[in-house]
Amino acid sequence: MADVRKLKNYIDGEWVESKTDKYEDVINPATGEVLCQVPISTRAELDQAAVIAEQAFEKWSQVAVPRRARVLFGFQQLLIQHKEELARLITLENGKNLSEARGEVQRGIENVEFAAGAPTLMMGDSLASIATDVEAANYRYPVGVVGGIAPFNFPMMVPCWMFPMAIALGNSFILKPSERTPLLMEKLVELFSEAGLPKGVFNVVYGAHDVVNGILENEIIKAVSFVGSKPVGEYVYKTGSANLKRVQALTGAKNHTIVLNDADLEDTVTNVISAAFGSAGERCMACAVVTVEEGIADEFLEALRTAAQNVKIGNGLDDGVFLGPVIREENQKRTIAYIEKGIEEGAKLTVDGRETGLSEGHFVGPTILEDVTTDMTIWKDEIFAPVLSVIRVKNLQEAVRVANQSEFANGACIFTNNAKAIRYFREKIDAGMLGVNLGVPAPMAFFPFSGWKSSFYGTLHANGKDSVDFYTHKKVVTARYSLKGYEE
C-alpha cells in the first residue's frame, strides 16, 4: 500500500497534508482497485479552513460582481475543455457508465453557467416613492462563509449546485466532498484556481463526523448546504439550525412512476428502465416504484422484464455497459438483504439481480419485485440501488393515493396522453418535482430542486432563485430626500 497516493486538503490556495493518522481507501467499485487514500481530517483542520475562508470573504465580497462573474465564466470554459477527463474520473471512482458521467459533467457545467449570471441574480429592487420624498431599495449581500456537505452519487453535479453559486454571489466556501469519491474534486479545484479564483475563497476538507460537526458548529460558518440520506440530513438540519445557521438539507426519496392504460408502451419501458436502473439506482430521482393500471399491466410488465434482463452490466468504462456497480461492498450486501426481505414479506421476484456472474466489483443487476404492497419494507425504505417495486392499481386515483402514503416526496412521474389525467396528477400528487412522459424529472439549474416532506429539510431549496435567496441577505434601505429648495 506504500505506493498509494494520499490526498491532501485544499486550504488557502494550497494542498495541505492532513494532520490525521486516519485514512480510508478510495476504491474503484467496478474492480476493487484502490485508487488513492483520503484523509479523515480533524476538527482543527476544519476550524483552520473556516478562519481562512472568513479572511478571504472580507476581500472577495468586495470584488465587483461582474469581475466575480468573469471568474465563473473562465471556470465554465475550463470545465468544457476538460469534460472527458472529468467524466472518466467520475466513472473511475463512482462506477456509473461513461455516458452517464458525461451527462453529469454537463449538468455541472450548466450550474456554473447559471451562477455566472451573478450580476443579474444579485440585483435588488426599489420603489421611487413610498411616501412624500421617501424611497426604498432592497439590496442583496452575501451571507459570509458557507459550508457544503456533498454525497458520492453525483460528485460533480451536486457540489456544482453549491459552491459556484455561493462564490459567484460573494461568499467564501468550505466543501466536504464524499470520502468515497474525492478524486474529481481535486480536478475541479485545479480548474477553478486556474480560472483566477483568489486563495482562500474555496477550500476543501476531506473527512467524516468531525468535519461535519465542525461545519455545523463553527460560528464562522453562516450557512450549510447538504445532500445525502434522510437520517444524516435530519441531523444536519437540527444541529445546524440549533447553532443559528441557515440550512438546506436535501435528503431521501422513494419516487413513484404511474403508468396509465393509454401510455406509449415502448417509450414508457425505455424511460422506466433508465430511471430505475441508471446510475445503479443510486440517485435521489431514481424510479423506485411503478404503479401500473390493470389494463396495460400484463403487456407492460412482460416488456419491462425482458428489457431489464437484457441490460448490459459491467465496468462503466467499457463500451455498451449500461449498469455499473453500486458504490461499495456493504451497499451490495444491503441491497441483497432488501431483496430477500421483500421476498420474505410476500413480493414476487420476477427479475433477480443478486447474481451477475461478475467476479470483480460490487454489482447488483436489475431487480424487479412485483405484487408489492405499501406495508412492505421494500416499499417504505429508500434502497438506493437498482431495485424496482411494482404495484398494480385500478385507476389513477388509486395510484396517487399509493404514492402519497410515502414519507418521501422528491419526485413522481406519469406516462399518459390524457390531459385530464395529467392535470389531476399535477394537482393531487405530493411531490416537488414531476415528470410527464419522462422518467427522471430533475430540473435544470434555473429551477429549484424542490423536494417535499421527508425529502427536504429547510425553507430554501438548491438551485434556481431559491439558491440566490439562500446564499444572500437582503438589506432594505429607506431614505428621505427632500426636494425643498428645488421648487420651480
From Swiss-Prot:
Q: Per the record, what are the reactions this protein catalyses?
A: 3-oxopropanoate + NAD(+) + CoA + H2O = hydrogencarbonate + acetyl-CoA + NADH + H(+); 2-methyl-3-oxopropanoate + NAD(+) + CoA + H2O = propanoyl-CoA + hydrogencarbonate + NADH + H(+)
Position of the signal peptide: none
Which GO BP terms apply?
Answer: inositol catabolic process; thymine catabolic process; valine catabolic process
Which sites bind NAD(+)? Answer: 150, 152, 176, 179-180, 229, 251, 382
Q: In which pathway does it act?
A: Polyol metabolism; myo-inositol degradation into acetyl-CoA; acetyl-CoA from myo-inositol: step 7/7
Q: What class of enzyme is it?
A: oxidoreductase
Which keywords describe this protein according to UniProt? Answer: NAD, Oxidoreductase
List the InterPro entries. Answer: Ald_DH/histidinol_DH, Ald_DH_C, Ald_DH_CS_CYS, Ald_DH_N, Aldehyde_DH_dom, MeMal-semiAld_DH, MSDH_GmP_bac
A single Gene Ontology molecular function, please?
Answer: methylmalonate-semialdehyde dehydrogenase (acylating, NAD) activity
Q: What is its EC number?
A: 1.2.1.27
Name the Pfam families for this protein. Aldedh
Q: Which residues form the active site?
A: 284 (nucleophile)
- Describe its partners and assembly state: Homotetramer.
Similarity comment: family membership: Belongs to the aldehyde dehydrogenase family. IolA subfamily.
Q: Which HAMAP family match?
A: IolA (MF_01670)
The record, for NCBIfam families, names:
MMSDH
Q: What does this protein do?
A: Catalyzes the oxidation of malonate semialdehyde (MSA) and methylmalonate semialdehyde (MMSA) into acetyl-CoA and propanoyl-CoA, respectively. Is involved in a myo-inositol catabolic pathway. Bicarbonate, and not CO2, is the end-product of the enzymatic reaction.
The name this protein carries in UniProt is Malonate-semialdehyde dehydrogenase
Q: Which organism is it from?
A: Listeria monocytogenes serovar 1/2a (strain ATCC BAA-679 / EGD-e)
Gene name, Swiss-Prot/TrEMBL: iolA
